[in-house]
Every structure is written in C-alpha cells, then in structure tokens.
C-alpha cells in the first residue's frame, strides 16, 4: 500500500476494531467511519432478537474504540435517506415480486465499498479498509485484482462482498483475510478492547427483531389469504399472503388435503396470490439462470463452483455466459430449493470469486 492514509469502516464490533488496531500498528493514518443506516428510534421501539449492526450501542462502541486506539479522525455519517432508497425500498420491492432479497449484498456495493470511497477521497485517503474476512490480491493467473475466500472458512465473507464493483478492488484493504476469528478475539483481549467478546451481528440492521412480516406490514405491504395448489393443480390449502413465504419453506400453510405429506413452497405467483407446493424430491434443480451479473473475471464457459445462498456450500457446476450480464449454471448434482432473488456466486477451484448475480425465476426451468 503506497498511501499511508486509510479510511476504516468501524461498525463497533470486534473485527473492525482489531483491523483498525493492526493498521495503526503498521503506522497508517487511520480515519474511522461509522454509518447510521436507520433511526435510533427503531431500536428503542423494537427489541433486538439477535445482535444486529448499526444500533445506537454500536455507535457508542465505535466511538469508544476510536478514542482508545487514538485514531486520527472519526466520523459518523448519516445515510438513512440513501439507505432507504437503495436498500429498504429494494427489500420491499423484491418481496412484492414474490422473491427473497439479500440486502447486505447491495449495502456492501453501494455504501460500505461505494460511498465510503467517496468519503475517503474527500479526506485524501486512497484506501478503504474493513474487518471483513476475505483476501484481496493481484492475480497473475487472471491479470487483475481479485477477491477470494479468507483462511477462516467459518467466517469467510467473500460471498457477501461478491457484488461489489470490481473497479474498487485496487483501493480496498482487508487486514483480517489471513487470520482466524480466535486470533482476533485474542488480540482484542490482550489490548483491552471493550468489544473483545461482543457477539457477531446476525440480523438485518433495519429489522432488529427479524420479523419480516411485521416490517412489511408496517411499510404498507399487505396481502390477503390465498390458495395453495399441488403440482397437479389441486387446491389443497390456504396461506396467509404470498409475501410471507420463500421457496423451500414448509411452515405457515393450512392444509385440508395431503396434510400427512412433507410439502415445500415450490413456486410463488404474486399477481394471483397463489403458492404451489411440492414434496421434497421435487425441490431439486440442476440448472439456474443468473442475471445482472457482476464479473470480477470475464469468461465464456468454466468449470467452477456455485453458492446460491449465504448458508450453503459451493457446489461443482459448469457455468456458461449466455449474454453480457447473464449466466447459465449447470450443477453436477441437483441442489435444493433454488430461490429467486437470492445471489449466486461463482468461484474457481482455489476460492477466487469470478462473478455474482441474481437468480431470476422468469428465466428458470423447473425448480
């Protein structure tokens, strides 16, 4: 890194705190940046079910860490208006379309590694750093900067950053990519950080209680009860509104036929407020289409690995480019419950992220 001034994304958690400490130890001038994405009132009215980011307590923790580490500067930036337009509105729109969104992907692209770079430029800092677990490096194989999996397979966050703009990579730095979580907590304890044993964030910052149905209803999204059909077109039950369901889900359906069969949501038709359900063996797919693809490495056809949701493993697949920003993924073995709206990320055999995009139901075959 040739420029010694770095903008550090400070969430108030242990990872970004230790990352900031490590940069200070390497004599970088570190400027802390903390985003406010939602009003503090949200957290006073809605209790956190699990730990979320961007809460008022996180802001206070980030301030304390910035002071303890004697950062060169620390800024709290209010992005509530932009965040609503780019992230919350997208979240609501995607559910209205009968799909399942992943707002963290877009937050990383537009804010953590988008707007943060603009702020870094205003400080004369050419670098943005964070406490994410992944590796950025120049690849001789691909003749470009790439991101790849961090060494800690349990904390690797390459999937969540697979939709950031490739052009930002030369300006990003991830100090924790070659470290393990246990090392981070050990360092935090040794230097006396108050957040050393703070739990990791698990839920969306704008839905502290993780109750999507409540959130959608409070934002004017209401649906009526609808009908449930099996694959043969028989009406076999009712549901509470199509936006309350995702592909693969089993709960929340009232059956008056086939109640003894294990059935999953197979397809969602938002315009008709109808769900199609199917037994487990019908929920597997060998192909999917990925649209709005973000390429880190351009290719026509490769044998690689595809991950289709945050809590899943990559599966071997042949991936073919069928249009400028569209991929066809053919899996070696069928995978369960491919979910429109989620992101599919393509890796090579060494864990390098090649591309990422949105699974789109309109172009998919049987799912």
From Swiss-Prot:
Pfam annotation, one family: tRNA_Me_trans_C
Positions bound to ATP: 9-16, 35, 131
Region named Interaction with tRNA: 155-157
Biological-process GO terms, alphabetical: tRNA wobble position uridine thiolation
Family according to the record: Belongs to the MnmA/TRMU family.
Broadest EC class assigned to this enzyme: transferase
Feature type site, description Interaction with tRNA: 132, 342
Active site residues according to the UniProt entry: 107 (nucleophile), 205 (cysteine persulfide intermediate)
Alphabetized NCBIfam families for the sequence: PRK00143.1, trmU
Compartments where located: Cytoplasm
Disulfide bonds: 107-205
Residues in the signal sequence: none
Protein name: tRNA-specific 2-thiouridylase MnmA
């Amino acid at each position: 890194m040739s420029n010694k001034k770095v903008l550090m994304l400070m969430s108030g958690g242990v990872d970004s705190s230790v990352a900031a400490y490590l940069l200070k130890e390497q004599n970088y001038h570190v400027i802390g940046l903390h985003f406010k994405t939602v009003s503090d009132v949200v957290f006073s009215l809605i209790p956190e079910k699990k730990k979320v980011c961007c809460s008022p307590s996180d802001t206070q923790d980030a301030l304390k860490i910035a002071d303890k580490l004697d950062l060169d500067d620390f800024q709290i930036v209010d992005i509530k208006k932009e965040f609503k337009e780019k992230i919350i509105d997208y979240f609501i729109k995607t559910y209205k379309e009968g799909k399942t969104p992943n707002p963290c992907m877009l937050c990383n692209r537009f804010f953590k590694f988008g707007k943060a770079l603009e702020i870094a430029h205003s400080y004369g800092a050419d670098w943005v750093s964070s406490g994410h677990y992944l590796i950025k490096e120049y690849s001789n194989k691909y003749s470009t900067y790439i991101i790849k999996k961090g060494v800690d397979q349990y904390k690797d966050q390459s999937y969540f950053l697979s939709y950031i703009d490739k052009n930002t990579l030369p300006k990003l730095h991830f100090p924790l990519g070659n470290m393990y979580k246990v090392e981070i907590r050990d360092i935090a304890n040794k230097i006396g950080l108050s957040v050393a044993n703070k739990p990791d964030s698990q839920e969306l910052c704008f839905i502290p209680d993780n109750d999507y149905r409540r959130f959608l209803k409070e934002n004017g999204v209401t649906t009526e009860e609808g009908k449930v059909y099996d694959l043969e077109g028989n009406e076999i039950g009712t549901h509470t509104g199509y936006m309350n369901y995702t592909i693969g889900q089993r709960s929340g359906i009232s059956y008056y036929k086939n109640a003894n069969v294990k059935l999953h949501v197979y397809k969602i038709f938002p315009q008709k407020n109808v769900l199609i359900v199917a037994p487990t063996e019908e929920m597997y797919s060998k192909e999917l289409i990925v649209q709005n693809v973000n390429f880190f490495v351009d290719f026509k056809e490769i044998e690689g690995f595809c991950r289709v949701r945050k809590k899943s493993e990559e599966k071997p697949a042949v991936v073919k480019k069928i249009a400028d920003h569209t991929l066809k993924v053919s899996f070696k073995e069928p995978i369960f419950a491919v979910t429109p709206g989620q992101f599919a990320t393509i890796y090579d055999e060494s864990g390098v992220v090649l591309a990422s995009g949105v699974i789109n139901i309109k172009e998919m075959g049987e799912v």
